Amino acid sequence: MVGFKATDVPPTATVKFLGAGTAACIADLITFPLDTAKVRLQIQGESQGPVHATASAQYRGVMGTILTMVRTEGPRSLYNGLVAGLQRQMSFASVRIGLYDSVKQFYTKGSEHASIGSRLLAGSTTGALAVAVAQPTDVVKVRFQAQARAGGGRRYQSTVNAYKTIAREEGFRGLWKGTSPNVARNAIVNCAELVTYDLIKDALLKANLMTDDLPCHFTSAFGAGFCTTVIASPVDVVKTRYMNSALGQYSSAGHCALTMLQKEGPRAFYKGFMPSFLRLGSWNVVMFVTYEQLKRALMAACTSREAPF
């Protein structure tokens, strides 16, 4: 057996909630530079935005983007928006991942045999619910990642300053900008990510190809990351463009998507695909492996406290 052993007692909702948020924060710490590179590539080609990321630098590929940012803005630029990112994951992942099993059981009325439809419903529900909780943190994270030091001063000096500036200049709605595409994106991402992970893991275990250990979690998470990137990239690009846009630049997320299609063609919807895949693939592996181990460790700790002898 690799890692912590599974306990006879299933993890509680609280353990899943805390475990999911913590695991997502660990995954974000490791993969954040890839996410920043993805954002820069996705907004490249925009004419205007509240944060001008591409005014003095053109980005080519994942490593090219990272190296250009390090050269022109310094290594710390790769972690722009990290605080907001961790705030987002602690509130966001706790809901969309931590509550997934509980919502799935609600839809299946406690049955152990969940259909694909029930899993999709659960993924859509927790994904959309998470946006309602964490949207402002996502807006601030994207704005920080998009802003460049080269060619001018930084618009936001700190995370708190970013929240205040956006609320003052754009109103309360500014903090909830892009909610519609984000709800769509996260319903899709959650379904692709959690349901694919669920199905791959179940298939591997039922076929006796693997046991419920780290290799199984790694394989399932990697497959889920690839499927999620393919399905969610178009919505993710629109979400990023719309949240980073200047006030009045786009009338809606749909207008943003139509403008992209007309000016840049359909390939624009897959801008930043490679960093998206590298980020989502690695993020999924780190998050799911850590999450599975955290659940077991926390339940083992709870069990040992209840029965010390």
Curated annotation (Swiss-Prot):
Annotated TM spans: 17-40, 78-103, 120-145, 174-199, 218-242, 269-294
A family per Pfam: Mito_carr
Keywords annotated in UniProt: Membrane, Mitochondrion, Mitochondrion inner membrane, Repeat, Transmembrane, Transmembrane helix, Transport
Example GO BP: negative regulation of neuron apoptotic process
Source superkingdom: Eukaryota
Annotated GO MF terms: antiporter activity; chloride transmembrane transporter activity; GDP binding; L-aspartate transmembrane transporter activity; malate transmembrane transporter activity; oxaloacetate transmembrane transporter activity; phosphate ion uniporter activity; protein homodimerization activity
Sites annotated Important for inhibition by GDP: K141, R185
Subcellular location: Mitochondrion inner membrane
Function: Antiporter that exports dicarboxylate intermediates of the Krebs cycle in exchange for phosphate plus a proton across the inner membrane of mitochondria, a process driven by mitochondrial motive force with an overall impact on glycolysis, glutaminolysis and glutathione-dependent redox balance. Continuous export of oxaloacetate and related four-carbon dicarboxylates from mitochondrial matrix into the cytosol negatively regulates the oxidation of acetyl-CoA substrates via the Krebs cycle lowering the ATP/ADP ratio and reactive oxygen species (ROS) production.
Name of the protein: Dicarboxylate carrier UCP2
